[in-house]
From Swiss-Prot:
Domain of life of the organism encoding this protein: Archaea
Annotated GTP binding sites: 107-114, 189-193, 247-250
Role description: Involved in targeting and insertion of nascent membrane proteins into the cytoplasmic membrane. Binds to the hydrophobic signal sequence of the ribosome-nascent chain (RNC) as it emerges from the ribosomes. The SRP-RNC complex is then targeted to the cytoplasmic membrane where it interacts with the SRP receptor FtsY.
Designated name of the protein: Signal recognition particle 54 kDa protein
GO BP annotation list: SRP-dependent cotranslational protein targeting to membrane
């Protein structure tokens, strides 16, 4: 998950509150200090942290919770609301109003711009849009080839000419090429040679004048932390149609600093990069993002992922219900894990369920691709009866399965252990408690 370290630290602060016997001024101040420490360690600007935590402390000390809501729950809601406000409050999606809509992307060298463009193209393609990419990066050797390699498996065309040195000419020709082809969205990749904001903005203005984009997107590297403020501010002041993608939030300790710095400028964050896969680009919604960060889940995000799986006809509603109630067998487990894998790691999906958050044992959910392949080989050596009723698998059956699959007894046991862990985990979920929590945080019902 994006900003997992920060999320765990914030979640621990809220757990401390939940475990305390009384909620007095000292308890509130201690929780606020924990939140301050977590945010400062994530490279969030100290002044911004102090302003935020002062608001949290003031509200927590002065506000009376509504009827039916405990003081602890109300303080958690205050933390959720203030963090959401801190990161921009509302989601601001890219609007596709005209055909074609032209998007120009810019970014400092090493920001992850080219990869983000491929992810953005895939994001729109999955939503039914026909997308064309224009590579006008004439500076970086291999930029055109890299972009082609990333999107060709998905049938997305890239216009470019590695021999051409005039970026503006390439951008104009590329936009015209895709206009004639009748695509819905044209994404233009600009040069990635700039090491500072001034020259980047100069080029952005030149290309913008030539191709007249509907929106200009600045790609910011999340690992630069609060330094992102200067980039975002200079960009916001230079164009009225600008939006931002913050990348590399999956592995950076400074991602919180980058996100908060950009939000402080008022520049709209449209997407965040949360992993290396081409599907690891998320529309940025502060409410849903903070909800996941605090371990409160993201029901809307979960439903959207399952809807995508259903569109691929790999995941039916009754399958999902069986899975979430812990009433699945080995056959179901493999089919659903394989389908879920296409939408991201299982842990990422389970973190969208309120209450699961950071309490998930990693061993119970981190089923990597290699292990999945091995599990399939093992399951291929099982009988239909064993797949449907794993409880009948005794030691002699384990020996036979291991022999037939070319694996060890230990590996067969590992599969069965993984299966039992997952069943146990899902069965232990308190559905009523989670539903009550979701309603209190206006996170929507989730029909479990």
């Amino acid at each position: 998950m994006a900003l997992e370290k920060l999320g765990k630290a914030l979640n621990n602060a809220l757990r401390k509150l939940a475990r305390s016997s009384t909620v007095d001024e000292a308890t509130i101040k201690e929780v606020v200090r924990d939140i301050q420490r977590a945010l400062i360690q994530a490279d969030v600007n100290v002044r911004l942290v102090l302003d935020l935590t002062k608001r949290i402390e003031k509200r927590a000390l002065e506000e009376e919770p509504p009827t039916g809501v405990s003081k602890k729950e109300h303080i958690i809601k205050i933390v959720y609301e203030e963090l959401t406000k801190f990161l921009g409050t509302e989601a601001k999606p890219i609007e596709i109003k005209e055909k074609p809509t032209v998007l120009l992307t810019v970014g400092i060298q090493g920001s992850g711009k080219t990869t983000s463009i491929a992810k953005l193209a895939r994001y729109f393609q999955k939503r039914g849009y026909k997308v064309g990419l224009v590579c006008s990066d004439t500076w970086r050797p291999g930029a055109y080839q890299q972009l082609k390699q990333l999107v060709e498996p998905f049938g997305i065309e890239v216009f470019g000419d590695p021999e051409e040195k005039d970026a503006i000419k390439l951008a104009k020709e590329g936009v015209e090429h895709f206009r004639e082809k009748g695509v819905d969205i044209i994404i233009v990749d600009s040069a990635g040679r700039h090491k500072e904001e001034k020259s980047l903005i100069e080029e952005m203005k030149q290309i913008s004048a030539a191709i007249k984009p509907h929106e200009v997107i600045l790609v910011i590297d999340g690992t630069i932390g609060q330094q992102a403020y200067n980039q975002a501010l200079a960009f916001k002041e230079a164009t009225p149609i600008g939006s931002i993608i913050v990348t590399k939030l999956d592995g950076s300790a400074k991602g919180g600093g980058a996100l908060s710095a950009v939000a402080a400028t008022g520049a709209p964050i449209k997407f965040i990069g949360v992993g290396e896969r081409i599907d690891d680009l998320e529309p940025f919604d502060p409410k849903r993002f903070v909800s996941r960060l605090l371990g409160l889940g993201d029901i809307q995000g979960l439903l959207e992922k399952f809807e995508e799986l259903q569109k691929q006809q790999e995941f039916r509603e009754e399958d999902l219900e069986k899975f979430l109630k812990g009433k699945f067998n080995l056959k179901d487990m493999y089919a659903q894990l394989e389908a879920m894998q296409k939408m991201g790691p299982l842990k990422q999906i389970l973190q969208m369920i309120p209450g699961m958050g950071y309490s998930l044992p990693d061993d119970a959910v981190r089923v990597g691709e290699e292990r999945l392949k091995k599990f399939k080989v093992i399951m291929d050596s099982m009988t239909e009866e064993e797949l449907e009723h794993p409880e009948i698998i005794n030691y002699s059956r384990i020996k036979r399965i291991a022999r037939g699959s070319g694996t060890s007894i230990q590996e067969v046991r590992e599969l069965l252990h993984q299966y039992n862990q997952m069943k146990k985990m899902f069965k232990s979920m308190d559905k009523r408690k989670l539903s009550k929590m979701a309603r209190k945080f206006n996170l929507g019902g989730f029909g479990l």
